[in-house]
C-alpha cells in the first residue's frame, strides 16, 4: 500500500509536469495524488482494483475495455502505474497494466517513460509531430 510521502511526491510531480486543464491518471491505490496535484482523473476508475479483479468485466463501460475507452476519450497528460500496491493478494497495478496487451499498446503508442517518483512507472504524453 502507498505511503503518504509517495502519494505526496506523485501529486507534486503531476502538478509540475501538467497544466491545470489536463487530466492525469493513476492506475493503483493512490488517488490522493489527484488532490495534491489539483488535477482531474482521466477515468472513473480512480483506483485499479475493480479493473484488475474483473468487476463487471464484459458489461459496457467496465473492465479493461471501459478503462481504455475512458483513457482514449480523456487523453491524460501523465499516466502513473503503481508498483507493489496489491501484491500478493492480486497482481500489482503496473504489472497488470503492462501485461494487458490493449492497455500496454495504448500507452506505448502515445506516451514515453519518464523518471518519476519511486514506486511508480510514470509515462508522459508524447508531443504531437509539428
Located regions from the model:
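Extracytoplasmic
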Residues: 1-129
